Amino acid sequence: MADDAGAAGGPGGPGGPGMGGRGGFRGGFGSGIRGRGRGRGRGRGRGRGARGGKAEDKEWLPVTKLGRLVKDMKIKSLEEIYLFSLPIKESEIIDFCLGAALKDEVLKIMPVQKQTRAGQRTRFKAFVAIGDYNGHVGLGLKCSKEVATAIRGAIILAKLSIVPVRRGYWGNKIGKPHTVLCKVTGRCGSLVRLIPAPRGTGIVSAPVPKKLLLMAGIDDCYTSARGCTATLGNFAKATFDAISKTYSYLTPDLWKETVFTKSPYQEFTNHLMKTHTRVSVQRTQAPAVATT
């Protein structure tokens, strides 16, 4: 009976999974009871976590002194970091300070190639702008073999490059600041100039600078560009360079009040005005000595 069962449909029979008979698997890897994976599928998959699932959010463990201070709430805003020009080396610091207000947008994804002995190696370059629409903006670019990896890396680099944006008024100081404080210029291949505009004008510019200016929280601005603006990467970098220079100018309202100290003649004028008895000094002339 056992021989009949094995011949009919058992593991060793023609109808069993170990043979290439009718209705069964053909030989090779993965066939039979002791096949590839041993009943656990074709492996656990690649990437983050199990196949088809999402990686669990892990708690942020800072690795720098600045990260520890931010997580322990010793530093509560980015302005305290910018005040002392401390380098930000963890993107989680930006997430911790700005939180859900931070928005990102992919400006462009372009393929780039490198000639090698084996042929052309193609990678993808991603340009990502990030900002909170309230005075903070960043720009990042990353190359990778995969588009998703390039975008993810560009977002991290954009967070690390976030700069504060100084805003001002065009005329009367009524309401909230709405435009750039003064004329600023940025250069990266092409030259971009930002000019203050009256309230209600909007952003008069090309689409790429307009996205960066909106993310920076600027509502009204004139722009002018010179050079080759068709290269999106250089155009975006020049705009970001101009925006980052808004805190580079020491405007008169930031000048420290100069305190002049009086000279002793001015400080003791009343004392010098008092009448004093004049002391006359008689000069006595020494008698001449005759020499022989």
UniProtKB/Swiss-Prot annotation:
Domain S5 DRBM: 102-165
Sites of the Glycyl lysine isopeptide (Lys-Gly) (interchain with G-Cter in ubiquitin) crosslink: 54, 58, 274
PROSITE patterns: RIBOSOMAL_S5, S5_DSRBD
Subunit and interaction comment: Component of the small ribosomal subunit. Interacts with zinc finger protein ZNF277 (via zinc-finger domains); the interaction is direct; the interaction is extra-ribosomal. Interaction with ZNF277 competes with the binding of RPS2 to protein arginine methyltransferase PRMT3.
Modified residues (Phosphothreonine): 251, 269
One MF term in the entry's GO annotations: RNA binding
Keyword Ribonucleoprotein applies: yes
Function: Component of the ribosome, a large ribonucleoprotein complex responsible for the synthesis of proteins in the cell. The small ribosomal subunit (SSU) binds messenger RNAs (mRNAs) and translates the encoded message by selecting cognate aminoacyl-transfer RNA (tRNA) molecules. The large subunit (LSU) contains the ribosomal catalytic site termed the peptidyl transferase center (PTC), which catalyzes the formation of peptide bonds, thereby polymerizing the amino acids delivered by tRNAs into a polypeptide chain.
Position(s), cross-link Glycyl lysine isopeptide (Lys-Gly) (interchain with G-Cter in SUMO1): 274
The protein, known as: Small ribosomal subunit protein uS5
Post-translational modification remark: Citrullinated by PADI4 in the Arg/Gly-rich region.
Annotated stretches, region: Disordered: 1-56
Entry keyword set: Acetylation, Citrullination, Cytoplasm, Isopeptide bond, Nucleus, Phosphoprotein, Repeat, Ribonucleoprotein, Ribosomal protein, Ubl conjugation
Positions of post-translational Phosphoserine modification: 263, 280
Similarity comment text for this entry: Belongs to the universal ribosomal protein uS5 family.
Keyword Metal-binding tagged: no
Localization terms from the record: Cytoplasm; Nucleus, Nucleolus
Pfam families referenced in this protein's UniProt entry, alphabetically: Ribosomal_S5, Ribosomal_S5_C
Species of origin: Oryctolagus cuniculus (Rabbit)
